[in-house]
Amino acid sequence: MVTLTFLLSAAYLLSGRVSAAPSSAGSKSCDTVDLGYQCSPATSHLWGQYSPFFSLEDELSVSSKLPKDCRITLVQVLSRHGARYPTSSKSKKYKKLVTAIQANATDFKGKFAFLKTYNYTLGADDLTPFGEQQLVNSGIKFYQRYKALARSVVPFIRASGSDRVIASGEKFIEGFQQAKLADPGATNRAAPAISVIIPESETFNNTLDHGVCTKFEASQLGDEVAANFTALFAPDIRARAEKHLPGVTLTDEDVVSLMDMCSFDTVARTSDASQLSPFCQLFTHNEWKKYNYLQSLGKYYGYGAGNPLGPAQGIGFTNELIARLTRSPVQDHTSTNSTLVSNPATFPLNATMYVDFSHDNSMVSIFFALGLYNGTEPLSRTSVESAKELDGYSASWVVPFGARAYFETMQCKSEKEPLVRALINDRVVPLHGCDVDKLGRCKLNDFVKGLSWARSGGNWGECFS
């Protein structure tokens, strides 16, 4: 274990990285505080993890409202960063593909005509302006939803040590504080700060970013399953594209790259992502369903229950959540950082609002470690299954850009013991492993008992065998 190198975010505040400038959150028609991204939903809600957050409140089987006889006593948020440019390696790959098409095509027919003059200008890794605004909106929504607590509380905030994750936390704070300052009923107007930034390293335990489980990191299962499914649906698209781009020879992987560009180009074009990229019109609605399922397969067999060590990557966070909900020391020997979780300054147990910022892959592992998708049958490797058929699981429903999970404890007049509830992107996910009620909740002690797999360390020992 390397020496502790967490950063107190006071330094970030002093350096001016957290902007206090007013924002026009919610004023754009495509992306709003309440509903998220709602433009071209037949396409944009099928971009897998590259979909911008959209509210699943209309997909509820039970109400997400707080029962009248209950009050929220604690809330934990786990958030993905906002919309970003492609990763550095993929940005280079996409640019190379566009350049090759332009160099080899003798004609650009039909909907592919735009490629003749398309100029690849996407950056790499960082949030787009739209992605920044997503997190401002998320901070506003969080304050509004939990106003009864937030008026008098300063949330404790952590972030994994990636620039886009840290920036997402800062933008969330901007939105949260904007909403608080606009609330005449707020009694504690102190601004939150990112109190802990956990380094991302193969040698540093980090519950918000996988990396230390050697056997898991070497696994190629998710990529293999995704490649096999791509081989089932991409050839027809490839043939059509080559017909419209004579002189060009594409691979199945190139087809997926062109589909990826639909989202990445859209979220980078304007600050509100209101202009749908011309890449999007190259594919049919049915093809977008297959693309969305491809991404769901990759996450399930890469980081979820489809990978023997997938859920194990979420054990550490699960045990941190248990500690926070029960106000007791962390009991874990997997990916938690013992130096951090044993220090009240870096892991307090007396807060009532916690906010953590992470990545999509780690969030998938965490959700499966928590058993939230225990009702999801193993995904078919050959045929598309909908989110409803998979008990609410799909990449776009679970980990879109700006995804957020709320874990609540509530005290109700009809119950002596606190109740626990989980919401993912505004959809109540009924708990598993405990005596769940009609509102998807379990009593706190029963919920903790139901997490016996994570509490015992699961199969973490296989990481190094």
UniProtKB/Swiss-Prot annotation:
Q: Where in the cell is it found?
A: Secreted
Which Cys-Cys disulphide bridges does the record give?
C30-C39, C70-C412, C213-C463, C262-C280, C434-C442
Respond yes or no to whether keyword Zinc is given for this record. Answer: no
Q: Which UniProt keywords apply?
A: Disulfide bond, Glycoprotein, Hydrolase, Secreted, Signal
* Biotechnology: applications noted: Phytic acid is the major storage form of phosphorus in plant seeds and, thus, in seed-based animal feed. Phytases are therefore of considerable economic interest.
Q: How does activity depend on pH?
A: Highly active from pH 3 to 5 with 4-nitrophenyl phosphate as substrate, and from 2.5 to 7.5 with phytic acid.
Q: What is its EC number?
A: 3.1.3.-, 3.1.3.8
Q: Name one GO molecular function term.
A: 3-phytase activity
SUPFAM superfamilies the UniProt entry points to: Phosphoglycerate mutase-like
Q: What is this protein called?
A: Phytase A
Naturally occurring in which organism (per UniProt): Aspergillus fumigatus (strain ATCC MYA-4609 / CBS 101355 / FGSC A1100 / Af293) (Neosartorya fumigata)
Question: What gene is this protein translated from?
Answer: phyA
